[in-house]
Structure formats: structure tokens, C-alpha cells
């Protein structure tokens, strides 16, 4: 444990054994030890710690990109949470007495940004962990049901879930259309529960909590293994040697440099435009020496920018 929040935030753990050599406004620099044991240092919690306490102690955050502390998000009793006020102007088809019968965990498995594949790969290869994480989220929040929201195109992941859910009556799947931005939180609520929320409303207004699929797995690790949140799944692709195929890396230690992962994926193929950390729509330009964080979803290397002879280019409307 190398940092604790003073306000809204989450614990931060070192992903390597070593010595802190420098602290800046946005980084803690660690000189890694020559020998790196495979095992991690378990989170320090009392024997009678609740599952929510374990999630908080582990520093789990929303792994889909937003990074909101999961221990705060799950700190709700959905069984006792009333429906929020539904705006009839954006819900003209709903009856005045519309209600949602129980609390829901909505698992965001849309992996909405184009080109990303690490969420679907985790579903395919770690289905049991996904289900365990879902059940823990349900238990903590007193949710009676879960809906896994996943795009129709992810056939292999859907098949893996169908098999895993054969005996799980409280967990179902909802197939999303293959369009952007289906992974936006309120879009998931709308698609799964049929309610349009105002932009100022949280999913709790629909008696729901939205959890990214990787986040659910980190919840399972915190509870089952007392594992701190020290790694990230991500996709690397773009203008790389060997082509534009997706390179999926699971459990990458937080703090590894962008450049190191690009080299692992084959290295940059000649000249390029920029390196984007995050998705193609919502990511930000970054540098080779930048570290990945708990919220890094992808590293994309773009082609060279065309010469527009000084013309201004921008997105007028996005989503």
C-alpha cells in the first residue's frame, strides 16, 4: 500500500517490489528490486471484515475507464432503494405507475469502444470468476437479479455465458445492438430495464448499479484472494509491426510504460500519427513513457495524419 485517499478515491498499491524514489503531483516512482517474487502482498483487513470492506481495502475502481471507487458504488442497499422520479418527457411509453420490482446489478460487457477485446476475452477464459464477482456484487448490494449486457457480435463470449448461466436463475443476458455508445452507463440502464434516465440521474434511480465486467472480476479477487487492485487488462493495436490485429494482455502490472507494451506487441511500424491511451472515441493522446493505470483500457497507435494544409477539423457532435 503506497497511497490512501483523503477524499473520494481508492487505495493505491505498488505493482512491484522495490523502493519509492520520487513522488510527483501525478506519479509515485518506484525503483524495482532485482528479484520480483510471483506472489503479491495480501490486503490487510480484519478477520471479520465484510466483503465491502475487502473491496474498499483492495482499491478496486471502475475498470471500464471512469475509475469511480467500487467500494463507494457498491455501498448501497438496492432492496430498500426506491425508484427515482422518472421523467415522462423522455419516457412517453411508460405508464404512470411504472416500477422496477427489485434491485439489479447490470454488468457492462458491451466493450463499446471499437477494437477493444480484453473484456470479451476475459468472459471467454474466466467465466467462473465473472460469475463469482457478479454474485458478490449482488450480495453486497442486496440485488435480487443481474443482467449482463453484451453486444450481439460477441458470439464466443455469449456462448460461454449461456453455458455458465444454465443453472443461474437470477442472472440473465441482454444482447445489445452493435452500435456506439451502447456501453454508456445510462444506455445500459435503458437497454436492460427500459428506463431513460435524466443526465443528472444515477442508475440507482432505476434501482440498479452498473458494474464493468473486469471490475466484477477484481471484486472476486479482492474477496477470494485478498488481492489488491494492482493490474489491468487491456488491448494494444494499431500501426504495429505484424499488422493491426488486437494484442490482448491480461493482468498487466499498473505502472508499466506504454512503450514497453507497444514493444511487446511488435513495436510501431514506421511513422505514425499519435499514441492514444484509451478507446478511439474517448481516449487521450499519450507518450511512450506514460504509465498505464487502473483505468487504461487500450493503447492505440494511429496512422500518420494527412496534411490538411491548415484546415480545422473537429467532431461537432459525438454520441
What do the predicted segments below correspond to?
Residues 115-125:
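Glycine-rich phosphate-binding "P-loop"
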Residues 19, 23, 82-89, 174, ...:
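Residues forming the flavin
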Residues 1, 13-22:
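Generic structural motif
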Amino acid at each position: 500500500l503506497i497511497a490512501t485517499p483523503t477524499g473520494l478515491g481508492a487505495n493505491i498499491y505498488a505493482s512491484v517490489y522495490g523502493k519509492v524514489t520520487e513522488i510527483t503531483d501525478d506519479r509515485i516512482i518506484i525503483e524495482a528490486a532485482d528479484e520480483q517474487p510471483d506472489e503479491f502482498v495480501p490486503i490487510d483487513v480484519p478477520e471479520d471484515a465484510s466483503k465491502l470492506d475487502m473491496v474498499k481495502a483492495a482499491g478496486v475502481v471502475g475498470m471500464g475507464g471512469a475509475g469511480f471507487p467500487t467500494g463507494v458504488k457498491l455501498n448501497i442497499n438496492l432492496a430498500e432503494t426506491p425508484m427515482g422520479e422518472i421523467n415522462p418527457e423522455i419516457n412517453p411509453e411508460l405508464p404512470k405507475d411504472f416500477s422496477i420490482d427489485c434491485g439489479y446489478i447490470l454488468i457492462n460487457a458491451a466493450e463499446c469502444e471499437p477494437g477493444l477485446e480484453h473484456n470479451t476475452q476475459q468472459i471467454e477464459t474466466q467465466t467462473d470468476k465473472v460469475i463469482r464477482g457478479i454474485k458478490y456484487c449482488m450480495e453486497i448490494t442486496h440485488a435480487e437479479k443481474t443482467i449482463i449486457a453484451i453486444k450481439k457480435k460477441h458470439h464466443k463470449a455469449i456462448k460461454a455465458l449461456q453455458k455458465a448461466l444454465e443453472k443461474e436463475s437470477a442472472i440473465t443476458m441482454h444482447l445489445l445492438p452493435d452500435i456506439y455508445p451502447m456501453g454508456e452507463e445510462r444506455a445500459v440502464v435503458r437497454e436492460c430495464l427500459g428506463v431513460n434516465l435524466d443526465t443528472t440521474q444515477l442508475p440507482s434511480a432505476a434501482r440498479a448499479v452498473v458494474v464493468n465486467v473486469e471490475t466484477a472480476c477484481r471484486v472476486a479477487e479482492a474477496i477470494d484472494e485478498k488481492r489488491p487492485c494492482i493490474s489491468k487488462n487491456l488491448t494494444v493495436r494499431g500501426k504495429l509491426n505484424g499488422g493491426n490485429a488486437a494484442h490482448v494482455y491480461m493482468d498487466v502490472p499498473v505502472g508499466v510504460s506504454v512503450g514497453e507494451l507497444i514493444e511487446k506487441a511488435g513495436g510501431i511500424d514506421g511513422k505514425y500519427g499519435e499514441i492514444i491511451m484509451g478507446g478511439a472515441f474517448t481516449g487521450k493522446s499519450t507518450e511512450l513513457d506514460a504509465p498505464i493505470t487502473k483505468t487504461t483500457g487500450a493503447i492505440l497507435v494511429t496512422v500518420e495524419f494527412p496534411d490538411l494544409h491548415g484546415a480545422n477539423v473537429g467532431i461537432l457532435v459525438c454520441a
